[in-house]
């Protein structure tokens, strides 16, 4: 039937129907309830440090090191210098990995005077500098962090089978400490490498530590308790014995512990993982998808409303959203949780008043209690740390310089023991912004030592 007079009305009704359909779609995608994915336990596993070391001892001789790489990235000269310093330390640690790659902002090459000095330094230690375009979102809330998405270029390095990545504002540590909180001084006191991370099960697409400092504690803490020290070690020993008998990569992954409750992950969709150290399996597909998570193209946004980037979202939040979505959508995507007490430590942890979240194992993090703070033994802890991330805001990073007069000194710590000298303390910090006094002098000594260790490297290798 042909409606001539009503044609305008018919067209109008179709426009209303189309608009109404689009509106319903947006409401649905915004309000849809995401049910807990019961397959999470199969695809998200905790990798205890003891297991990582056992895998390395058993399988490192079979690795093709030429297909592996350590990678860092840098968007400015300071971080380029830091990345090169870290890789010089790695070379000194006798790493077996030949490929040390710094992905850097290609615009830095335009400042020939500064760039040439860093290029020459990198050549001396066989460090590869690879220029890349910046990944930036101009709508980001903070210009300081807007270029952090450049980190995602590591996923595009598909010439390598596996990459161990860590932020340039990190430092490798050595672990030989005396019980009196003094460093053992001998020629072998070179920081250890992270080569063992290349031997985690190949089936794992990405492995990261948990952002332990952001963990929310669950009300179930009174009902579920982590095993005591001996009980946990017995479980780990049994696990290692099982894994040592497995030659199948999938079976090894299957035997790894899961989170105690899956809500531990769902309660931290945007900040469960820390991204300052990662083990990744490079993939063009993942790289291209992450760029969409950064820039939110309109067609992609239509079916990814829950993944849209907020102005305050940067590399950590974006990667967490991506991992969360892929774990729900792809049953073949495998994720490992690295031990934060070895690879994910923040320097600021030594200034904290309480350490319950830090001392807990990853799978027990939501169920921590105040009693765990008794397990904070700084000397034992520093002996196990292999990589530490400089994070003490508002205290400046050590290469930015600090003094004893500014407001941030009130966030520092100072030893208050039997030998405390009040006159010396007041002369060192003459303003009202004084460090917090603490009887945890081991933590004070370790924090100061970390800063001093960085300064030694700075004095030797800083070029810019």
UniProtKB/Swiss-Prot annotation:
Cytoplasmic side, ranges: 1-14
GO molecular function per UniProt: transferase activity
Leader sequence segment: none
Chain positions of motif DXD: 167-169
EC class of the enzyme, as a word: transferase
Membrane-traversing stretches: 15-35
Predominant location category: Golgi
Subcellular location: Golgi apparatus membrane; Vacuole membrane
Membrane topology category: Single-pass type II membrane protein
GO CC annotation: Golgi membrane; vacuolar membrane
EC number: 2.4.1.-
Keyword annotations of the record: Glycoprotein, Golgi apparatus, Membrane, Signal-anchor, Transferase, Transmembrane, Transmembrane helix, Vacuole
Family: Belongs to the GNT1 family.
PANTHER family found in the cross-reference section: GLYCOGENIN SUBFAMILY MEMBER
Protein name: Glucose N-acetyltransferase 1
Organism field: Debaryomyces hansenii (strain ATCC 36239 / CBS 767 / BCRC 21394 / JCM 1990 / NBRC 0083 / IGC 2968) (Yeast)
Lineage: Eukaryota, Fungi, Dikarya, Ascomycota, Saccharomycotina
């Amino acid at each position: 039937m042909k409606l001539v007079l009503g044609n305008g009305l018919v067209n109008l009704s179709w426009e209303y129907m189309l608009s109404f359909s689009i509106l319903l779609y947006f409401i649905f995608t915004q309000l849809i309830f995401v049910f807990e994915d019961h397959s999470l336990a199969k695809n998200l596993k905790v990798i205890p440090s003891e297991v990582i070391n056992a895998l390395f001892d058993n399988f490192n001789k079979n690795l093709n090191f030429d297909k592996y790489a350590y990678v860092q990235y840098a968007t400015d000269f300071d971080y380029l210098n830091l990345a090169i310093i870290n890789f010089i330390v790695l070379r000194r640690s006798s790493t077996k990995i030949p490929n040390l790659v710094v992905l850097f902002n290609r615009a830095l090459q335009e400042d020939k005077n500064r760039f040439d000095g860093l290029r020459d330094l990198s050549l001396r230690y066989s460090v590869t500098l690879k220029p890349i375009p910046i990944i930036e979102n101009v709508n980001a809330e903070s210009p300081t962090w807007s270029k952090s998405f450049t980190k995602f270029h590591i996923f595009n390095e598909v010439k390598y089978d596996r990459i161990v990545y860590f932020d340039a504002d990190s430092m490798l540590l050595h672990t030989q400490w005396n019980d009196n909180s003094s460093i053992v001084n001998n020629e072998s006191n070179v920081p250890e490498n992270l080569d063992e991370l290349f031997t985690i099960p190949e089936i794992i697409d990405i492995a990261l530590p948990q952002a332990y400092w952001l963990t929310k504690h669950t009300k179930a803490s009174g009902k579920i308790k982590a095993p005591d020290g001996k009980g946990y070690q017995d479980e780990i020993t049994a696990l290692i014995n099982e894994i040592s008998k497995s030659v199948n990569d999938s079976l090894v992954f299957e035997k790894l512990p899961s989170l105690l409750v899956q809500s531990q992950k769902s309660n931290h969709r945007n900040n469960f993982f820390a991204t300052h150290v990662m083990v990744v399996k490079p993939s063009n597909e993942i790289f291209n998808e992450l760029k969409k998570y950064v820039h939110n193209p309109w067609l992609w946004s239509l079916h990814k409303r829950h993944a849209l980037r907020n102005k305050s979202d940067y590399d950590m939040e974006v990667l967490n959203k991506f991992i969360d979505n892929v774990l729900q959508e792809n049953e073949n995507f495998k994720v490992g949780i690295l031990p934060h007490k070895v690879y994910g430590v923040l320097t600021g942890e030594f200034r904290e008043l309480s350490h319950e979240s830090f001392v807990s194992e990853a799978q027990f993090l939501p169920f921590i209690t105040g009693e765990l703070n008794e397990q904070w033994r700084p000397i034992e802890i520093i002996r196990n740390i292999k990589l530490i991330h400089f994070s003490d805001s508002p205290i400046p990073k050590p290469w930015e310089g600090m003094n004893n007069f500014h407001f941030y000194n009130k966030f520092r710590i100072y030893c208050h023991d039997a030998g405390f000298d009040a006159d010396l303390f007041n002369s060192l910090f003459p303003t009202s912004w004084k460090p917090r006094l603490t009887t945890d002098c081991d933590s004070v000594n370790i924090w100061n030592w970390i800063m001093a260790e960085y300064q030694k490297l700075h004095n030797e290798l800083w070029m810019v």
